[in-house]
C-alpha cells in the first residue's frame, strides 16, 4: 500500500486549484533549473535507474526509449505526448490533464531537454475540450513566467510546447497514426521499421510518451531514482493511477503502488464489488483491450508481469468490474463493435476480421450458432492477432479469446441447437 507522502499526484481529484500558484505550493517547478543543469545524460540515466515503464500500456522502459534518440544531430527532433486517451474503461490521463497540468508541462520540459528536442507537441483527444482548455491555460502561465519558451527556467535551453487537438479517432492513440494525424494526414499507422526514434514527426527523430509517463518524471528527478524504484515490485516499480469502474460501490481513480492486489484495490478504494466479493463474475484489469479474468484469478497483483502470467495485461490500468448480473457474452460483443468501428481499415485481417467477429459475437449473444463456431471464432482471433501493422487487431482479438478461455461453458449453455445454420 502506498504511503501518503509517496503520492505523486496530490491533486488527482481536483481538491485544489490547478493554476500555477497552487501547483507550485504542491512542489511543481521547484528548482527545475537545477535539474536541467545536471545535464541530459543524468536525466536519462536517472529515469532508467528508476525502472519507470511506459504507463500507456506497452510497459517499455521510458529511459531506454529516450536513449534510442540519436545525439548531436543538426536537424530537429521532437517530443510528442500521447494524450489521446480513448480506451474504454480508462480515464487516468484525463484527470492529470484536468487537475495536474503543470506536472505534465514540467515533465515535457525535462523530457524534451533529455532527448534534445526544442519542440514538444501534446496531442490531446478531440472530445477533451475542458482538459485542453486547462492545459492551454497552464501553458500560457508557464510561458508568462519564463518556465518554458526561450531560455526555459533561465537554463539556456529553448523549449516550445504546443497543444494539438485530435478529432476523435481511437486509432490515433497508436503512436505512428498519431504522428500522421499531427502532420495533417489521415490517422493511419505506419509500418515499422523505421521507428519514430529514427524517422518520426516530419521525418525527424521523435519520442512518443504517454501523459502519465511524462508527468511523473519531475518527481522522480527530485526525489531520486532509488525512491521510485523502492515502490512496488522488482521490474514493476513506482506508482500507477488505476481507474476503477463498473459494478463497484464507489467508482474512482486512485494512485497506488505497482503490485497491489486487484482485490485490495477494489475493496479499499472502490467500496468493494456491488453485492459483495462473492457476487463478482469477472474483471477486465487493464482497459478494454486486455483479456478478462474470472473471479478465481481476481486476487492477482496489479503489475505488468503478474497480469501477463495470469493471461491478461496491465494495459492502461483501467479496471472494469462485472458482477453476476452481467451478460458477459454481450459485454464482450459490445467491445467487438467498438473495435470494428474504430479500425482504420488499412490491414485486411483487421478490416475484415473485426466486422466478422462482431457479427458472430452478436449471434452468440442470441445463441444462434453451432458449437463448432466457437472454435472457428477463436481461430479467427488468432489469425488476426500479430498479423496487422498496429496492435488494434490484437486489441480486438484478446477480449474474445479471454471470453472463450474462461466462459466457454456459458457460451455453450446459451447455444439453442447444433442444427442452427
Swiss-Prot record:
<keyword id="KW-0408">Iron</keyword>
<dbReference type="GO" id="GO:0051287">
    <property type="term" value="F:NAD binding"/>
</dbReference>
<dbReference type="InterPro" id="IPR054765">
    <property type="entry name" value="SLBB_dom"/>
</dbReference>
<dbReference type="InterPro" id="IPR019575">
    <property type="entry name" value="Nuop51_4Fe4S-bd"/>
</dbReference>
<keyword id="KW-0874">Quinone</keyword>
<dbReference type="Pfam" id="PF22461">
    <property type="entry name" value="SLBB_2"/>
</dbReference>
<comment type="similarity">
    <text>Belongs to the complex I 51 kDa subunit family.</text>
</comment>
<dbReference type="InterPro" id="IPR050837">
    <property type="entry name" value="ComplexI_51kDa_subunit"/>
</dbReference>
<dbReference type="InterPro" id="IPR037225">
    <property type="entry name" value="Nuo51_FMN-bd_sf"/>
</dbReference>
<dbReference type="InterPro" id="IPR001949">
    <property type="entry name" value="NADH-UbQ_OxRdtase_51kDa_CS"/>
</dbReference>
<feature type="binding site">
    <location>
        <begin position="166"/>
        <end position="213"/>
    </location>
    <ligand>
        <name>FMN</name>
    </ligand>
</feature>
<keyword id="KW-0285">Flavoprotein</keyword>
<keyword id="KW-0004">4Fe-4S</keyword>
<keyword id="KW-0288">FMN</keyword>
<feature type="binding site">
    <location>
        <position position="390"/>
    </location>
    <ligand>
        <name>[4Fe-4S] cluster</name>
    </ligand>
</feature>
<dbReference type="GO" id="GO:0048038">
    <property type="term" value="F:quinone binding"/>
</dbReference>
<keyword id="KW-0520">NAD</keyword>
<feature type="binding site">
    <location>
        <position position="344"/>
    </location>
    <ligand>
        <name>[4Fe-4S] cluster</name>
    </ligand>
</feature>
<feature type="binding site">
    <location>
        <position position="347"/>
    </location>
    <ligand>
        <name>[4Fe-4S] cluster</name>
    </ligand>
</feature>
<dbReference type="Pfam" id="PF01512">
    <property type="entry name" value="Complex1_51K"/>
</dbReference>
<dbReference type="Pfam" id="PF10589">
    <property type="entry name" value="NADH_4Fe-4S"/>
</dbReference>
<dbReference type="InterPro" id="IPR011537">
    <property type="entry name" value="NADH-UbQ_OxRdtase_suF"/>
</dbReference>
<keyword id="KW-1278">Translocase</keyword>
<dbReference type="GO" id="GO:0010181">
    <property type="term" value="F:FMN binding"/>
</dbReference>
<feature type="binding site">
    <location>
        <position position="350"/>
    </location>
    <ligand>
        <name>[4Fe-4S] cluster</name>
    </ligand>
</feature>
<dbReference type="GO" id="GO:0051539">
    <property type="term" value="F:4 iron, 4 sulfur cluster binding"/>
</dbReference>
<dbReference type="InterPro" id="IPR011538">
    <property type="entry name" value="Nuo51_FMN-bd"/>
</dbReference>
<dbReference type="InterPro" id="IPR037207">
    <property type="entry name" value="Nuop51_4Fe4S-bd_sf"/>
</dbReference>
<dbReference type="GO" id="GO:0046872">
    <property type="term" value="F:metal ion binding"/>
</dbReference>
<protein>
    <recommendedName>
        <fullName>NADH-quinone oxidoreductase subunit F</fullName>
        <ecNumber>7.1.1.-</ecNumber>
    </recommendedName>
</protein>
<dbReference type="GO" id="GO:0008137">
    <property type="term" value="F:NADH dehydrogenase (ubiquinone) activity"/>
</dbReference>
<comment type="function">
    <text>NDH-1 shuttles electrons from NADH, via FMN and iron-sulfur (Fe-S) centers, to quinones in the respiratory chain. Couples the redox reaction to proton translocation (for every two electrons transferred, four hydrogen ions are translocated across the cytoplasmic membrane), and thus conserves the redox energy in a proton gradient.</text>
</comment>
<feature type="binding site">
    <location>
        <begin position="54"/>
        <end position="63"/>
    </location>
    <ligand>
        <name>NAD(+)</name>
    </ligand>
</feature>
<keyword id="KW-0411">Iron-sulfur</keyword>
<keyword id="KW-0479">Metal-binding</keyword>
